[in-house]
């Protein structure tokens, strides 16, 4: 019998992440398991794919949106991926601003682009912006062009990387206290 749990990351995904093309970002796109059928997930995936790096999109159990698999060989679509195993490879996260993605990105010191959909997502996006650990695109502006532009800024703005790193350190210090 094999192991009870699958490997942390599928082998082909791990290899793609390790073969990082020069100066190309590795971006994780997730909308969790509640907002995984939102059109914004497809917009976010398209926007990330435009930047040409390695993109990992998780859809959850019922979030298969038509067309995600056709975004290019550099876009890897999975129902679930072990976020803790994936995030150390990433340069940024794009999400709806749910608790899981927020905590994962913050813990790993990753700049985070939030496309808020409902509930606490808007407040979470504002909190990230206040500490320069991320930014957001409002509901009415969530086009591929707007999201791609904002994601490009997020990846090139050194202040966002610094803010995300400081947030991770602050969270680690709280854990150690």
Model regions and ranges:
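Nucleotide-activated sugar donor-binding and catalytic core shared by glycosyltransferases
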Residues: 1, 18-21, 44-45, 65-177
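A nucleotide-sugar donor-handling region in carbohydrate enzymes
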Residues: 1-26, 31-35, 59-65
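Residues at alpha-helix caps and immediate loop-helix transition turns in enzyme cores, especially N-
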Residues: 9, 39-41, 124
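C-terminal, well-structured subdomains that either form a transmembrane helix-short loop-helix hairpin
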Residues: 28-30, 38, 89, 93
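Structural beta-sheet core signal
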Residues: 29, 55-57, 114
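Short hydrophobic signal-anchor/transmembrane segments that target glycosyltransferases
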Residues: 39-54, 60
């Amino acid at each position: 019998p094999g192991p009870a749990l699958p490997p942390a990351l599928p082998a082909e995904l791990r290899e793609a992440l390790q073969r990082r093309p020069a100066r190309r970002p590795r971006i994780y796109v997730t909308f969790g398991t509640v907002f995984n059928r939102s059109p914004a997930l497809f917009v976010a995936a398209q926007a990330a794919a435009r930047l040409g790096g390695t993109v990992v999109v998780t859809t959850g159990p019922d979030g298969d949106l038509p067309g995600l698999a056709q975004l290019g060989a550099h876009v890897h679509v999975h129902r679930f991926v072990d976020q803790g195993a994936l995030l150390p490879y990433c340069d940024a996260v794009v999400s709806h601003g749910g608790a899981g993605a927020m905590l994962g990105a913050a813990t790993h010191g990753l700049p985070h682009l939030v496309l808020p959909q409902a509930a606490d997502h808007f407040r979470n996006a504002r909190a990230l912006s206040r500490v320069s650990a991320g930014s957001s695109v409002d509901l009415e502006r969530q086009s591929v062009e707007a999201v791609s532009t904002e994601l490009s800024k997020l990846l090139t703005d050194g202040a966002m990387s610094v803010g995300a790193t400081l947030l991770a350190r602050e969270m680690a210090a709280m854990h150690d206290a």
